[in-house]
Amino acid sequence: MKLISNDLRDGDKLPHRHVFNGMGYDGDNPAGTKSFVVTCYDPDAPTGSGWWHWVVVNLPADTRVLPQGFGSGLVAMPDGVLQTRTDFGKTGYDGAAPPKGETHRYIFTVHALDVERIDVDEGASGAMVGFNVHFHSLASASITAMFS
């Protein structure tokens, strides 16, 4: 699998437009892909368990691009696609917000799944989604961006 972003480059500083307040995917889907899950996770958050910034589930297998603003609530989601609860306590994308003076990694990951949907609702945590993804993942690809 391969993840491509017009906004992010693996290992680079996270662009300011992604700081608290799009990326695209293209190609090499594994055989049997029936849906995708996209996440943004900060493993460096001072919580002992990281911080989920974005979780979107049940993207159709023919999804190739998520337009910029897809997680903002301003872009319509296809039927059946859900954004689940982040560690900010709500759905949708919330950008980088590391403590002052710290540099954090923001890992954007797309997971190809062998099921058309995972059975979670909008209140599901990133950990719960990750648990469900674990049992249905065919492949995943990530881009890691930095911000301080």
Report the location of each language-model feature.
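N-terminus-centered regions that define maturation/targeting leaders and the start
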Residues: 1-148
